[in-house]
Amino acid sequence: MFPLRALWLVWALLGVAGSCPEPCACVDKYAHQFADCAYKELREVPEGLPANVTTLSLSANKITVLRRGAFADVTQVTSLWLAHNEVRTVEPGALAVLSQLKNLDLSHNFISSFPWSDLRNLSALQLLKMNHNRLGSLPRDALGALPDLRSLRINNNRLRTLAPGTFDALSALSHLQLYHNPFHCGCGLVWLQAWAASTRVSLPEPDSIACASPPALQGVPVYRLPALPCAPPSVHLSAEPPLEAPGTPLRAGLAFVLHCIADGHPTPRLQWQLQIPGGTVVLEPPVLSGEDDGVGAEEGEGEGDGDLLTQTQAQTPTPAPAWPAPPATPRFLALANGSLLVPLLSAKEAGVYTCRAHNELGANSTSIRVAVAATGPPKHAPGAGGEPDGQAPTSERKSTAKGRGNSVLPSKPEGKIKGQGLAKVSILGETETEPEEDTSEGEEAEDQILADPAEEQRCGNGDPSRYVSNHAFNQSAELKPHVFELGVIALDVAEREARVQLTPLAARWGPGPGGAGGAPRPGRRPLRLLYLCPAGGGAAVQWSRVEEGVNAYWFRGLRPGTNYSVCLALAGEACHVQVVFSTKKELPSLLVIVAVSVFLLVLATVPLLGAACCHLLAKHPGKPYRLILRPQAPDPMEKRIAADFDPRASYLESEKSYPAGGEAGGEEPEDVQGEGLDEDAEQGDPSGDLQREESLAACSLVESQSKANQEEFEAGSEYSDRLPLGAEAVNIAQEINGNYRQTAG
């Protein structure tokens, strides 16, 4: 019985070991079990694979997820091929069970996040192919547990940077593919340039290991990077109000601001760490971008258009929207410029405030201890609900204030009583009635103020100090805040309108001890007003009530090129903050149109005139040369020389000088003459030599005359700058003739 059971057990084990899923092909070859499941349209890792399989091919399928436990039954796999799939997710622990894995191919997939911690169990890995994926980062210690890795392929991914020392632990690495990654060539990648120059690892296509950013270095190979001005961060921390000494207690109720300035290249990122009695608070300042500014500008324009529509269409008023209650003022606010705002100091905000700056080259930090005095009343009266009365920061109120008709806010004018509706005053003297609305007791208490604040309040009668906006600010369309002792007012000035922006530092004002308003009643908030007056003082031209949740106010209908002042004050009190500004001068539209038209006309006419002038110059013919033929009287000297050397005349004279041959006895005279000539030649008769020289001179003279005749037309031209050769020939002839005569005499 026992042998039968043992036999059955062996058969079962062999059957399980030899089973193979239906779409796959399993082959036992050279003591290795191959499972070929490629090109089978699989969407999951198949189950039921042989437990002793060593090579598993799942390439060219449609697998999207590698789930944890998918390879739990094939732990002896040494080669896993998963290329050309649709893998997007690799669950942590899916590959950690393959401790004997030597070759892993995950190329040509859609992996953007990989569980690098699984590689810690794959210490025998020799080949890792992760190319043609969507990897955006490679942790510094991701490959630290792969001492036998020889070939690493991470090309054609989305890697922007690599941490220094990423490849230091790969002692057996001989082949590395890094090309076609969008590297950001900043200070964090300088190490790669030095490492590539000194390593013995093969780096194929070094020219393709190039920068994608910044734009100035786009396309530059990493090994050709220029020297970059890199510096670690340095941090400077200051407080406002300033601390007289470290640990000096501050009075409760104050607004406290810490300014953190960090220098370094690249620009450091800031982080606030607050150790307060309630625990540790970590704050990250927001990052500003040009797109956000553009959206904000568009929203501002929409607000102005809505105000204009409300003022012009008073006959068909729209119902007021139900705005949500403004959020509570936050305890801490990290600003984009590196500052930290504590709107209301109390014992809960005491502690250690640390500003930490870090960039690619390191980190630095500095701290300051803030102590709050336990005694003393708060400087500003808190509002209802335990929160300070005022607006939240601009970033917190932006969504609440958007679209409100806050150019001028509703108020009860003189002669109006409860139950007769409200009036909206845009410019003093012009009112628009609105339907009667139900108001709460708090709003009724706020409306029971001066009948017309403009008649009682005059700008310039309060604090004598003024804060004048400069000309450069008025010429700009940007909001540039001016920080004062009691608050912040930001102005955006145009030709016929001005925008006033209030920020949180001017949010908690209450009536002063000597103010007209006296002490506020319980449950009533102090009323704050904005006045727009002429710069020289006098009654307000426009005014508006400062509402909670509204931080932008538009004053319209102003005169171009006029000086105005904006006064921020509490009802019945003197002006706390006053800003003097000038509206822009309005340029007539007709003048602009004429100037632009003239400029365009000149711009279009000048090239045409230049082309016409060039055409006329090209078509104008040049002045032609004229040939002038002038007859010349024959020179008697030339005639005589020609006659003297005429061979016909010499022949006739010889006929006359010598008698006929019959008379002289035949041919003897000629022989005698020839003999005489020979004798003269032998004796060197000077007269014969002179005659030969004279004949040669005459021949040369005739040749010079023939050459002069050939150039007669050129010499006689009106525009010729050459001397007539005829005159030179005459002079030479006279000289030769004179010499000849002297010799003959």
Curated annotation (Swiss-Prot):
Record's keyword terms, sorted: Cell membrane, Developmental protein, Disulfide bond, Glycoprotein, Immunoglobulin domain, Leucine-rich repeat, Membrane, Neurogenesis, Phosphoprotein, Repeat, Signal, Transmembrane, Transmembrane helix
Primary place of residence? Answer: membrane
Spans of the LRR repeats? 52-73, 76-97, 100-123, 124-145, 148-169
Specify whether DNA repair is a keyword of the entry. Answer: no
Cysteines joined through disulfide linkages = C260-C355
TM stretches of this protein: 590-610
Q: Where in the cell is it found?
A: Cell membrane
Residue ranges annotated for the LRRCT domain, each copy included: 181-232
Write down any Gene Ontology CC term.
Answer: cell surface
* Ranges facing Cytoplasmic side: 611-745
GO biological process terms on file? nervous system development; positive regulation of axon extension
Q: Which of the residues bear the PTM Phosphotyrosine?
A: Y719
- InterPro entries per UniProt: Cys-rich_flank_reg_C, Ig-like_dom, Ig-like_dom_sf, Ig-like_fold, Leu-rich_rpt, Leu-rich_rpt_typical-subtyp, LRR_dom_sf
Q: Where does the record say carbohydrate is attached? A: N52, N121, N337, N364, N474, N563
Q: How does it sit in the membrane?
A: Single-pass membrane protein
Instruction: Tell me the leader sequence span.
Output: 1-18
Question: Which residues carry the post-translational modification Phosphoserine, per the record?
Answer: S720
State the PANTHER family in the record.
IG(IMMUNOGLOBULIN) AND LRR(LEUCINE RICH REPEAT) DOMAINS (PTHR24366), IMMUNOGLOBULIN SUPERFAMILY CONTAINING LEUCINE-RICH REPEAT PROTEIN 2 (PTHR24366:SF15)
Q: How does it assemble?
A: Homomultimer. Interacts with NTRK1/TrkA.
What the protein does comes down to:
Required for axon extension during neural development.
Q: What is this protein called?
A: Immunoglobulin superfamily containing leucine-rich repeat protein 2
Source species of the chain: Homo sapiens
